[in-house]
């Protein structure tokens, strides 16, 4: 099989709107939670989220692109632009059929759908609909628009597995290049879930933190007082490339995509398996796919969303797989970014890759007292980043429906 490497990175997120600022803020351990400004959330159980700040879409896209696309697709286009430019590959020097796009999203154009229903009701339920309504809502539109904008004519589809969507896309991109079906694939994830129906819906599930008096400390993964997750938004995009192709053109290589895997909990529509059975096997499959042993992994970027059930089951799963690895460090960066749903695996894979390139483990912020039920043999990095040599890093993502998506990266 072909080897696959990462040659480009791009991000739009609450922690930063380009890779440099994003990584700086992540390493610094800065919270990005604040009162929701996009709508009046005072009547909701949760009044806060991790919104993207200091960002003007017109600086990145033209008016027609903004008008015709849902916010999640706009985020994907902006992050893709940074990643593609970072990679530096030139389409005119290769076949357009050798470049594909595989993006993940959990909710797609959810905000567009919500607004159209609101307009429909406001117009007395008269059948007058925006002609862009349907394409704006489609979950595949991020991958479609990236290919249309840049002329990539290879493999193109979207992965939908809730909060595991980006890592599902990453696994697919890895395998298609391994199999010789593409030279380059633009991959990652995007979601824009900070809307009234989305916040209200997650409140109804009792999934979000209600710590309205202190939003900046609300997300506290693995802490004994955790009470739910912090909603985020944005996109992460990575350029995957066949190793020999990247070397031949003199590309900068961040890391190698070592392996990936997916399993299912087959347990519950929203809750993870309490003993982490699916997650355990998923991590084992990913290690096998990469040809690595558990004691070779230096860092796990945990899915850890700061929910009572999810964090505990994941900690048990990590301990079951890596319990004998005294070199392993674990951190939960959703404490800073919030939960980007279908984009979570993309930005967290970027964090894992940057941990490899820079030798830094970012912190889990806000966590003061680790839950005594969390296995004591796990080294969870809290409060501040640490310097550490990282040769292999793993990204965990788990989604509603029982989807477990795991990605492994290693130093070249």
Name the predicted role of every residue range.
Residues 124-130, 171, 175, 192-248, ...:
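Glycine-/small-residue-rich "gating" segment that lines the acyl/pantetheine channel
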Residues 8, 26, 80, 101, ...:
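Conserved small-residue
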């Amino acid at each position: 099989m072909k080897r696959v490497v990462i040659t480009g990175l791009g991000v739009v997120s609450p922690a930063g709107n380009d890779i440099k600022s994003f990584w700086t803020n992540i390493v610094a351990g800065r919270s990005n939670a604040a009162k929701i400004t996009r709508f009046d959330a005072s009547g909701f159980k949760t009044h806060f989220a991790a919104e993207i700040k200091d960002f003007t879409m017109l600086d990145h896209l033209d008016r027609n692109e903004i008008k015709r696309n849902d916010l999640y697709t706009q985020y994907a286009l902006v992050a893709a632009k940074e990643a593609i430019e970072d990679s530096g590959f030139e389409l005119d020097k290769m076949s357009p059929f050798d470049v594909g796009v595989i993006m993940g999203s959990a909710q797609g154009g959810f905000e567009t759908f919500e607004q159209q229903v609101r307009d429909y009701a406001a117009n007395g339920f008269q059948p007058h609909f925006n002609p862009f309504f349907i394409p704006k809502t489609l979950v595949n539109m991020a991958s479609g628009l990236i290919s249309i904008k840049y002329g990539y004519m290879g493999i193109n589809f979207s992965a939908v597995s809730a909060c595991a969507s980006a890592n599902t896309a990453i696994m697919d991109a890895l395998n298609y290049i391994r199999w010789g079906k593409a030279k380059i694939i633009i991959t990652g994830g995007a979601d824009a879930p900070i809307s009234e129906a989305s916040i209200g819906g997650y409140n109804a599930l009792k999934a979000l933190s209600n710590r309205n008096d202190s939003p900046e400390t609300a997300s506290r993964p693995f802490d004994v007082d955790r009470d739910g997750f912090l909603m985020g938004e944005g996109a992460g995009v990575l350029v995957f490339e066949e190793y020999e192709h990247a070397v031949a053109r003199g590309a900068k290589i961040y890391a190698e995509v070592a392996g990936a895997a997916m399993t299912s909990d087959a347990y519950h529509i929203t809750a993870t398996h309490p003993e982490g059975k699916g997650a355990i096997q998923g991590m084992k499959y990913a290690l096998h796919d990469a040809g690595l042993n558990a004691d070779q992994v230096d860092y796990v970027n945990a899915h850890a969303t700061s929910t009572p059930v999810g964090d505990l089951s994941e900690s048990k799963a990590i301990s079951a797989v890596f319990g004998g690895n005294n070199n392993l460090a674990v951190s939960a960066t959703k404490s800073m970014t919030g939960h980007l749903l279908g984009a979570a695996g993309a930005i967290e894979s970027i964090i894992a890759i940057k941990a490899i390139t820079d030798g830094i483990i970012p912190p889990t912020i806000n966590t003061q007292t680790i839950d005594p039920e969390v296995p004591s043999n796990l080294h969870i990095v809290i409060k501040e980043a640490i310097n550490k040599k990282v040769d292999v890093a793993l990204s965990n993502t788990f989604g509603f429906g029982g989807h477990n998506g795991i990605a492994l990266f290693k130093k070249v």
